[in-house]
Curated annotation (Swiss-Prot):
It holds the Pfam family MecA. It comes from the Bacteria. Enables the recognition and targeting of unfolded and aggregated proteins to the ClpC protease or to other proteins involved in proteolysis. This is Adapter protein MecA. The N-terminal domain probably binds unfolded/aggregated proteins; the C-terminal domain interacts with ClpC. It comes from Streptococcus pneumoniae serotype 4 (strain ATCC BAA-334 / TIGR4).
Amino acid sequence: MKMKQISDTTLKITISLEDLMDRGMEIADFLVPQEKTEEFFYAILDELEMPDSFLDTGMLSFRVTPKPDKVDVFVTKSKIDQNLDFEDLSDLPDMEELAQMSPDEFIKTLEKSIADKTKDDIEAIQSLEQVEVKEEEQEQAEQEAESKKEPYIYYILSFAKLADLVAFAKTVTFEMETSELYKMNERYYLTILVDIENHPSPYPAWLLARMREFADDSDISRSVLQEYGQVLMSHDAVLNLQKIG
């Protein structure tokens, strides 16, 4: 469970399904407003330690967006008191004028006063909806970027001497899918295909840095090697080089 302050008036709380279960809640509980849900909201606010700007602010509005694996709760400060007092409605007519009003006129006047009083809340809700749309767009963009990541990387290393190539092969302990050996312009080129899908994002850079301790990183592409280079080993090159005494 984590909290993010989006603005002076809005917080976003992300709650995983596991967190919900630990607190005896499920997504269905949010579909119909109930006392249990409200108690849960205020309990997590106490647990997460609200910013000082949200303390003692009166009424809070909650907006829930269920997701497949989590629930996003947007919390907005309200500028209207939960218990409306006629004394707060300063633009209401005085008692003499009220006495001369018909019931319809009184209701219309009261509705206008309340509408003016709640204008800030309406704007807050509209702002919250815009924030929610932006959050969803950002999440979608991040998911699309993640899906476009290639699960495999080809590393291409260059060696001036065959002995250096063999020495490097004997240092390789990381997992690889396959490897190839080419010769072009009196140099040896080793291609190594690595599956990075289940590794943390820094792994490819870390692996390249480790390879550079023993070899030169090449900017020659695999397609160039395939077209102009001489294929010495078309697969499992590293494993075969490791067998050389």
